[in-house]
């Protein structure tokens, strides 16, 4: 665990959701707290990169430190700001809106980091639209080329990753990458968790 630091990005505008996604509760737990608790089970230190640390100070966030983000400039710049504080070889990068994230999957991925080829700067899930940059692992040495890309005006994770070697992370199930971006997404995830909750008494027909 000492060789892994986690960065959680909580700097999005949440415009499609209409409220701060990080504070939306699923099964009574704010999403940011849920993601950070999982990150803390895999990493010694968890950095939360956000322009609004005061919004989240009341949450239960073990082993977490805030990195104030200079405005909402997008996830790539937020990652670069967090990466500047990292001392470990590997960093786990997570978005704050992953309600189906599973700790055992991240721990298994982390346990296999030693087998990632030396030339790879990251190991990430891959899907039809490209890499999933906000749920995976990066080597700290990706910082110089990342900063160069940003200084040249780059803001896209996908465009940056095209220029580097990245190893594919095997997904046990694609649903762990589910993002809670809209009220419809929230309704879906809350409905699924409600279905999993035990019902102490059967519902009467016609009630």
From Swiss-Prot:
SUPFAM superfamilies: Nucleotide-diphospho-sugar transferases (SSF53448). Keywords: Cytoplasm, GTP-binding, Magnesium, Metal-binding, Molybdenum cofactor biosynthesis, Nucleotide-binding, Transferase. Its EC number is 2.7.7.77. Mg(2+) binds at residue 97. It comes from the Bacteria. It is found in: Cytoplasm. It catalyses: Mo-molybdopterin + GTP + H(+) = Mo-molybdopterin guanine dinucleotide + diphosphate. InterPro entries: MobA-like_NTP_Trfase, Molybde_CF_guanTrfase, Nucleotide-diphossugar_trans. Belongs to the MobA family. This is Probable molybdenum cofactor guanylyltransferase. The gene is mobA.
């Amino acid at each position: 665990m000492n060789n892994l630091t986690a960065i959680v990005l909580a700097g999005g505008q949440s415009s499609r959701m209409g409220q701060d996604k990080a504070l939306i509760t699923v099964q009574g737990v704010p999403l940011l707290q849920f993601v950070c608790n999982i990150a803390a089970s895999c990493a010694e230190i968890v950095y939360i990169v956000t322009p609004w640390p005061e919004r989240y100070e009341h949450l239960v966030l073990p082993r977490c430190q805030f990195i104030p983000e200079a405005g909402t400039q997008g996830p790539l710049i937020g990652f670069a700001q967090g990466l500047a504080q990292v001392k470990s070889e590997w960093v786990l990068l997570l978005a704050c809106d992953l309600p189906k994230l599973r700790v055992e999957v991240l721990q298994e991925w982390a346990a296999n980091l030693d087998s990632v080829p030396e030339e790879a700067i990251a190991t990430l899930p891959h899907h039809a639209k490209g890499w999933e940059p906000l749920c995976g692992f990066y080597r700290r040495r990706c910082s110089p080329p990342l900063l160069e890309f940003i200084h040249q005006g780059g803001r896209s994770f996908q465009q940056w990753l095209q220029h580097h070697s990245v190893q594919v992370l095997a997904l046990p199930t694609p649903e762990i990458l589910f993002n809670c971006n809209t009220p419809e997404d929230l309704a879906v995830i809350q409905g699924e968790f409600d279905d999993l909750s035990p019902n102490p008494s059967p519902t009467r027909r016609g009630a």
